Amino acid sequence: MINNDILRRLSNMFNFNAEKIQAVFALNQCEITSAELDCILKEHDDPDYQELTDVQLASFLNGLIVEKRGKQDGPDRLPEQELSNNIIFNKIKIALALKADEVIAVLELAGLVLGKYELSAYFRNVNNKHYKRCTDEVLSSFISGLKIKYQA
């Protein structure tokens, strides 16, 4: 999925305005100006469109974890330099403190049926033989299911 779309969909789901989005970024020591955010939230075909980098999205997701679960002791988590759908999926799951059964229920709201074993493969280490790459379809379904759950 495109990082800008993920940010836009999550922000809409939680009814975050521009100031709140900037505040979530700041929770992970990432400063985004209002002008930058305006360009990031524009549609792809807009000439002022600016691509959200993996580091920026990782910072937002780390900030979302702090926003939803509170700050933990120790140093702030450094944002990943490269993101995969698996990492994004896991960070959203952590931010919302969702257990496997809850994630499965959220996916079912979006019309995607997965078993616990299948789901756990997305959260394994990339070097694990049972690791499974998360597709755009699965991540999109998860975000769609969350929107249904949280806006119902």
Regions found by a protein language model. Name each.
Residues 62-113:
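Short, solvent-exposed interaction modules
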Residues 8-9, 31, 60, 74-76:
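Short, flexible segments with low predicted structural confidence
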Residues 39-75:
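N-terminal flexible/basic segments that precede or flank functional cores
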Residues 12-14, 33, 96:
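Helix-boundary capping/turn motifs
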Residues 1-8, 17-52, 112-136:
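A cross-kingdom feature marking solvent-exposed beta-strand/loop segments within repeated
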